[in-house]
Amino acid sequence: MTQPSCPCGSGDPLDDCCGRYHQGHPAPTAEALMRSRYSAYALGLVDYLRDTTLPAQQAGLDLDGIRAWSHGSTWLGLEVENHEVLGGQPEHARVTFVARWHDADGEHAHRECSGFVQRNGRWYFLDPTVALKLGRNDPCPCGAGGKLKKCCGPWIT
């Protein structure tokens, strides 16, 4: 039996692509995590979307809204425009992409440059829509030990 293709657009079977990350294997790059998150939206894997967001931001996610958007949309495709590893301790990266979907209001395209941070061997999405009540000189919520302004601050403040 033929496995379904991965929604991320790689052309690979789901189990050989994003499916392995959905099952708990860490994504090796920020781009792989971003692709797996797009696939999670297409497949309705809201817990995965929560778990791959920076832990300090997870409580602020609107999981019901994410679930409604995920299930109420037909996911049409993903185009990765750029993946840039920024380095640093912890390592940061950004991925620029266009996601396309169709819902009750028609077809949509969303272009975004997303930030990611790697902690303890796992990449996390830095969600700019989830506010953190932190000052620029407070410790960064990624747990690296540095100040927010020098670490993840440019992505989440």
Swiss-Prot record:
Protein name: UPF0225 protein PA1039
Superkingdom of source: Bacteria
Organism listed in the record: Pseudomonas aeruginosa (strain ATCC 15692 / DSM 22644 / CIP 104116 / JCM 14847 / LMG 12228 / 1C / PRS 101 / PAO1)
PANTHER family the record matches: ADENYLATE CYCLASE-ASSOCIATED CAP C-TERMINAL DOMAIN-CONTAINING PROTEIN, UPF0225 PROTEIN SCO1677
A family per Pfam: YchJ_M-like
Family: Belongs to the UPF0225 family.
Biological classification of the source: Bacteria, Pseudomonadati, Pseudomonadota, Gammaproteobacteria, Pseudomonadales
